[in-house]
């Protein structure tokens, strides 16, 4: 009996930088947009993420989530959540995931900058 190795999934975000800084104002603008709005997000190196907001949900007061279908990566979904505490700036977290891809992009706040970083999906736990 031979244990089969799961084949590694292809990396579909290879043309994007490993780390990109995203403008907070641009990310916050996404949460002021409505469903079916076309959006674009500027990344380091002059790269752009383009897509359409497919869903916007207020999960509870101070927590809003949006889903964006990325037009340049069919099947990829950019899920973003904004967490707002009274008297503080909102904190945005997110991830871009594709079920057939081996790579994931994770958005997090580090040292007052929003970073979109590439990670291997097999090391990434979905929440």
Which residues are covered by each model-predicted region?
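N-terminal prosegments of processed precursors
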Residues: 1-127
């Amino acid at each position: 009996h031979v244990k089969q190795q799961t084949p590694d999934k292809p990396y579909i975000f290879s043309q994007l930088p490993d780390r990109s800084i995203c403008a907070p104002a641009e990310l916050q603008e996404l949460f002021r947009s409505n469903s079916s709005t076309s959006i674009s997000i500027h990344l380091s190196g002059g790269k752009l993420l383009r897509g359409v907001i497919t869903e916007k949900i207020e999960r509870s007061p101070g927590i809003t989530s949006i889903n964006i279908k990325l037009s340049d990566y069919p099947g990829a979904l950019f899920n973003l959540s904004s967490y707002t505490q009274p008297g503080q700036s909102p904190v945005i977290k997110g991830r871009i995931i594709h079920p057939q891809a081996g790579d994931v992009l994770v958005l997090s706040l580090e040292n007052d900058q929003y970073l979109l970083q590439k990670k291997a999906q097999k090391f990434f736990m979905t929440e």
